[in-house]
């Protein structure tokens, strides 16, 4: 392998915005934020749950000051 060609690979902390769960994975980034993880996603938990988050329309309105 060539030196100084590949990005550094280290342990990253993944943080869930919905439930606050954190876990460690290997990545080129140090911190990763996700909206839903396996601890709170309805597919994995088997129950319906409504998650409050900004959708694409809200992000667009915020970006162009259309509130």
From Swiss-Prot:
InterPro entries: Ribosomal_bL28/bL31-like_sf (IPR034704), Ribosomal_bL31 (IPR002150), Ribosomal_bL31_A (IPR027491), Ribosomal_bL31_sf (IPR042105). This is Large ribosomal subunit protein bL31. Belongs to the bacterial ribosomal protein bL31 family. Type A subfamily. GO terms for cellular component: ribonucleoprotein complex; ribosome. GO terms for molecular function: rRNA binding; structural constituent of ribosome. GO terms for biological process: translation. The keyword rRNA-binding applies. Gene3D superfamilies: Ribosomal protein L31 (4.10.830.30). Keywords: Ribonucleoprotein, Ribosomal protein, RNA-binding, rRNA-binding. PANTHER family: 50S RIBOSOMAL PROTEIN L31, CHLOROPLASTIC, LARGE RIBOSOMAL SUBUNIT PROTEIN BL31C. The keyword Ribosomal protein applies. It comes from Finegoldia magna (strain ATCC 29328 / DSM 20472 / WAL 2508) (Peptostreptococcus magnus). The lineage of its organism: Bacteria, Bacillati, Bacillota, Tissierellia, Tissierellales.
